[in-house]
Amino acid sequence: SATREALSALKAMGLVEMKQGEGTFVKQFEAEQLIFPLSIAILMNKQDISHLLEVRKIIETGTAASAANNRNTEDLAIMAEALEEMKQAGPSDEELGEKADLKFHLALSAASRNPILSTLLDQVSELMVETMRETRRIWFFSKQTTIEKLYQEHLQIYQAIVEKDEEKARKTMISHIENVENILKKYFHEAIDKQ
């Protein structure tokens, strides 16, 4: 229901706490803790996120394969820099981690040398940032994965592109996006069960 989805969005933002058998309670917070834009509430609809992840699978798997064929040393340097920033950010600097994550995906897009793919990715990049942010928050706070696992997934994509292995690039990208999808589905399932 719409109420459950709204409560799930508020929970993900850290604004409410759900206690099984007791109810939903507004948490005390400082203004600086409210780090998510209001648009995240729109994305907290399970179906919307599912659709966005499907779009990402379609666009980014092809982008990764194309990048493996068309990348140059400058592209690899930007991807490597994004990976290093991601590694340095760790769980302590969420904002840097998010920026590095997006930088990596946009570098893949540029490496494809396909302006239409790049434009499509740019069109969904704002929504991607929101789901990346949400996924990172869920991952880190639910202990369902670690920053190292997220880094390793990106590193595998990068290595496939370095090797110019189109099929491996496609497979590692789809694996990464499916892992994101599974974590978000599990989160939504748990959030609904607790209500």
Question: How should these model regions be labeled?
Answer:
Residues R136-T145:
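Short helix-coil transition/hinge motifs at the ends and kinks of transmembrane helices
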